Amino acid sequence: MRIKRDRYLNQLIERRNNGLIKVITGIRRCGKSFLLFELFAEYLKENGVKDEHIISLPLDDDINEKYRDPHELSLYVRSFVKDSSATYYILLDEIQFAISREELKNPDVPVRLYSVLNGLLHLPNVDIYVTGSNSKMLSKDIMTEFRGRGDVVEIHPLTFQEYYACCAGMDKISAFEDYATYGGLPLVLSKKTDTAKIQYLKNLFQEVYYKDIQERYQIEDSDVIDEMTDVLCSA
């Protein structure tokens, strides 16, 4: 299943080679990686960019654990930038994996990764795109950390138009009922039963969003979040 996200793809295209770090943010599992590694990379290749000039690195993959160290990441990227006459497109996914726990926990501790990315931006022939989705990747934080060199593209879950385009054989009313019930996270479309959709969303909320909230606001007692959630959901 291939979902078109033309609205966001066009935003990346418009920002191409603008001298800033394109930062793709958004809630977990809303399609940031797919947009960057599939749709945008495909666009680049279709418009004449050679494979060797696209440096893609998913930092959530344990095979790339070494490059979660910002210094190693910098060395890795720079090792590919050899042809001064060509533009290199650096696509880094889930950059929060290159931010240490201490940097995440303490807002007063500078994030080394941001210095590395700012340093890479000094190379005259690179165009940088990154994705991230945790509490250190809020738009206001990014603009502060990148010192005016960040250009944020905020991704949202699927609109109903995007959602319905993937609902082959389903009438629009039924599709909207599903959309209104389960929302527009792309992976929901791959779940075949109501039970599977509910379980996916429940697991995502418990394992991901709770953790981000606790991390962002340094909440040690998870019962506080449970109680707040109950109040909001019953309102």
PLM ranges: what are they?
Residues 91, 95-129:
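Conserved Walker B catalytic segment
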